[in-house]
Curated annotation (Swiss-Prot):
Reactions accelerated catalytically: ATP + H2O = ADP + phosphate + H(+)
A Gene Ontology term for the protein's cellular component: microtubule
Cross-link (Glycyl lysine isopeptide (Lys-Gly) (interchain with G-Cter in SUMO2)): K20, K210, K214, K265, K275, K279, K392
Protein name: T-complex protein 1 subunit epsilon
Post-translational modifications: Ubiquitinated by the DCX(DCAF12) complex specifically recognizes the diglutamate (Glu-Glu) at the C-terminus, leading to its degradation.
SUPFAM superfamilies: GroEL apical domain-like, GroEL equatorial domain-like, GroEL-intermediate domain like
PANTHER family the UniProt entry points to: CHAPERONIN
NCBIfam families given in the database record: chap_CCT_epsi (TIGR02343), thermosome_alpha (NF041082), thermosome_beta (NF041083)
The protein's enzyme class: hydrolase
Location of Phosphoserine modifications: S26, S346, S539
Gene designation: Cct5
Quaternary structure (record): Component of the chaperonin-containing T-complex (TRiC), a hexadecamer composed of two identical back-to-back stacked rings enclosing a protein folding chamber. Each ring is made up of eight different subunits: TCP1/CCT1, CCT2, CCT3, CCT4, CCT5, CCT6A/CCT6, CCT7, CCT8. Interacts with PACRG. Interacts with DNAAF4. Interacts with DLEC1. Interacts with SPMAP2.
C-alpha cells in the first residue's frame, strides 16, 4: 500500500487513499484521451498525405548529426521522424510492419489509418460508443477484403514474358526519385528477381541480390551485373587488371606466418637474428603462395590483410590477390562462384576453389576509386544491381526505391493476383462497404459508412497531389464506377486522358492492398479501445 500512496481517514472515519506524487503525474481519461490520440495520429497522417502517389512530394529529413536524407518512402520518413507522442510512435510501427511484410504501400497505410481515426472522431462526437465504432470498422474491413478478392485479376508470372511484372514495378517506382528512368529500373528489378527466384517454391532469396552504389555518372548508367561487385581493388597496382577463367581461393584465415597461441616474446639481439626472422617469414610466405598455386588457383581473395612483403611476393609469383574483403561479400562470392570458404590454410584443396569467367577491375572517372567485378560465375543466381547517381542522396533513395520494387515483384511471384491502382480499388471497396452498410440494422452501420468515407481519402489525396479538384474528380470517378460497373476506374494522376487504370497499366498487388486495410483497421481498433493514459510528469522524469 505504501508504494501506491497513504491511507487516511476523514472526520467521519471513512478511509480514502492519497496517491503518491499525484501532483507530478499527468492523466487523461475517456473521450479526452481518445481525442488526444486521434489528434496525434492525424498529425502524422497529414504529414504523409502529400507524399502519396506519382506526384507526391519528397520530404527532407535532417538528423541530429546534420545528415540530410531526401525521400518519398513512407517507412523511411516515419523512422527518421522525431516523435514523442505514444500514438505517433504506433503509427511509425504500423508503417514499419507494412514495410517488413510487403515492402510497398507504407505511406498509404498511414494515410488510411489517419482517415479512419478522423471519421471515428466525428462518430464519437455524435455519442456512438468507441467499441461499436471498432466493431463496425472490423465488419467493413472484412467486406472490403472480400470485395478485393472479387475484383482482382491474375497476372501471368512467366520468365519468358516479364512485361506484366515490369508494369507492376513501374507503378511502384512512379512516385520515387527514379521515375525519370523508371522503365529501365523496373526492368533491372524484374530481371534481378527472375534470375534468383525459385519458381518451384515460388520464393525469392533477397540474400542473393546485392545493391551497390557509387557516386558519379547518371541514374541511367545503373545496370544489373550477373555476378558480384566488391568495393575493393587488387592488392598491388602492378597486378593484372583482368583475370580470365579465374579459379578463386576464398580465404578467411590470416595470410601470415603462424604465431604461437601462447603469450610470447621474441628477443632479437643482433642483425643476424633479425635477418633470420626475415628469412623465415619470406620462406613461409613463399610456401603459402606455392600451396595456393599447387591447387590450381590463379586468384586469392582474403578476408584479412597481408603485409607489403607478402604483397610483393604475390606479385613476383604472378598470383593476383584481393585483401580486406568483408564477411557478407565473401559469402556472396562463395555462393556465386561455387567455391568453399577456407578457414584454415592447411585445408585448401583444388575442390574448394570457386570459378568465374572473368574478374576485372573497373575505375571511375578521374578519382582513384576502383571496384572488382566478378562475372560469368558458376552459379548465375547471385546478382548485383549497380546504381550510379549524381550524389549520395540520390543513390540512397534509388536503393530504397529498388527495394520496394523488388519486394513487389517477389509478392507477385508468391501470389500473382493484382488490383488496379490510382485509387480504383479503394473507390470500389468504398462502394461495396456502403451498400452493405445500408443492409446493416444495427448501430454499426454508421461506422461502416465512415469506413467507406475513409477509404475515399486515398483517391482524394492522389487527385489533390496531382493538382486537380479532389472532390469533383472523386465524385466523377465514383459515379462512373457505379454506372459502368468497372472497378478499374481511378484517378488520372498522370493526365493521360483516361481514367481506366487497366489501360494505363497502373497495377498494385492484391496481397499489399489487403495488408494495408487489415493493418490500418487493427491499429485503429487498438487506439479506440484506449480510454485512460497515465504518464509521469516532467519533474518525475
Amino acid at each position: 500500500m505504501a508504494s501506491v500512496g497513504t491511507l487516511a481517514f476523514d472526520e467521519y472515519g471513512r478511509p480514502f487513499l492519497i496517491i503518491k506524487d499525484q501532483d507530478r503525474k499527468s492523466r487523461l481519461m475517456g473521450l479526452e484521451a481518445l481525442k488526444s490520440h486521434i489528434m496525434a495520429a492525424k498529425a502524422v497522417a497529414n504529414t504523409m498525405r502529400t507524399s502519396l502517389g506519382p506526384n507526391g512530394l519528397d520530404k527532407m529529413m535532417v538528423d541530429k548529426d546534420g545528415d540530410v536524407t531526401v525521400t518519398n518512402d513512407g517507412a523511411t520518413i516515419l523512422s527518421m521522424m522525431d516523435v514523442d507522442h505514444q500514438i505517433a510512435k504506433l503509427m511509425v510501427e504500423l508503417s514499419k510492419s507494412q514495410d517488413d511484410e510487403i515492402g510497398d504501400g507504407t505511406t498509404g497505410v498511414v494515410v488510411l489509418a489517419g482517415a479512419l481515426l478522423e471519421e471515428a472522431e466525428q462518430l464519437l462526437d455524435r455519442g456512438i460508443h468507441p467499441i461499436r465504432i471498432a466493431d463496425g470498422y472490423e465488419q467493413a474491413a472484412r467486406i472490403a477484403i472480400q470485395h478485393l478478392d472479387k475484383i482482382s485479376d491474375n497476372v501471368l508470372v512467366d520468365i519468358n514474358n516479364p512485361e506484366p511484372l515490369i508494369q507492376t514495378a513501374k507503378t511502384t517506382l512512379g512516385s520515387k526519385v527514379v521515375n525519370s528512368c523508371h522503365r529501365q529500373m523496373a526492368e533491372i528489378a524484374v530481371n534481378a528477381v527472375l534470375t534468383v527466384a525459385d519458381m518451384e517454391r515460388r520464393d525469392v532469396d533477397f540474400e542473393l541480390i546485392k545493391v551497390e552504389g557509387k557516386v558519379g555518372g547518371r541514374l541511367e548508367d545503373t545496370k544489373l551485373i550477373k555476378g558480384v561487385i566488391v568495393d575493393k581493388d587488387f592488392s598491388h597496382p602492378q597486378m593484372p587488371k583482368e583475370v580470365l577463367n579465374a579459379k578463386i581461393a576464398i580465404l578467411t584465415c590470416p595470410f601470415e606466418p603462424p604465431k604461437p597461441k601462447t603469450k610470447h616474446k621474441l628477443d632479437v639481439t643482433s642483425v643476424e637474428d633479425y635477418k633470420a626472422l626475415q628469412k623465415y617469414e619470406k620462406e613461409k610466405f613463399e610456401e603459402m603462395i606455392a600451396q595456393i598455386k599447387e591447387t590450381g588457383a590463379n586468384l586469392a581473395i582474403c578476408q584479412w590483410g597481408f603485409d607489403d612483403e607478402a604483397n610483393h611476393l604475390l606479385l613476383q609469383n604472378g598470383l593476383p590477390a584481393v585483401r580486406w574483403v568483408g564477411g557478407p561479400e565473401i559469402e556472396l562470392i562463395a555462393i556465386a562462384t561455387g567455391g568453399r570458404i577456407v578457414p584454415r590454410f592447411s585445408e585448401l584443396t583444388s575442390e574448394k576453389l570457386g570459378f568465374a569467367g572473368v574478374v576485372r577491375e573497373i575505375s571511375f572517372g578521374t578519382t582513384k576509386d576502383k571496384m572488382l567485378v566478378i562475372e560469368q560465375c558458376k552459379n548465375s543466381r547471385a546478382v548485383t544491381i549497380f546504381i550510379r547517381g549524381g550524389n549520395k542522396m540520390i543513390i540512397e533513395e534509388a536503393k530504397r526505391s529498388l527495394h520496394d520494387a523488388l519486394c513487389v515483384i517477389r509478392n507477385l511471384i508468391r501470389d500473382n493476383r493484382v488490383v488496379y491502382g490510382g485509387g480504383a480499388a479503394e473507390i470500389s471497396c468504398a462502394l461495396a462497404v456502403s451498400q452493405e452498410a445500408d443492409k446493416c440494422p444495427t448501430l454499426e452501420q454508421y461506422a461502416m459508412r465512415a469506413f467507406a468515407d475513409a477509404l475515399e481519402v486515398i483517391p482524394m489525396a492522389l487527385s489533390e497531389n496531382s493538382g486537380m479538384n479532389p472532390i469533383q474528380t472523386m465524385t466523377e470517378v465514383r459515379a462512373r464506377q457505379v454506372k459502368e460497373s468497372n472497378p478499374a476506374l481511378g484517378i488520372d494522376c498522370l493526365h493521360k486522358g483516361s481514367n481506366d487504370m487497366q489501360y494505363q497499366h497502373v497495377i498494385e498487388t492484391l496481397i499489399g492492398k489487403k495488408q494495408q486495410i487489415s493493418l490500418a483497421t487493427q491499429m485503429v481498433r487498438m487506439i479506440l479501445k484506449i480510454d485512460d493514459i497515465r504518464k509521469p510528469g516532467e519533474s518525475e522524469e
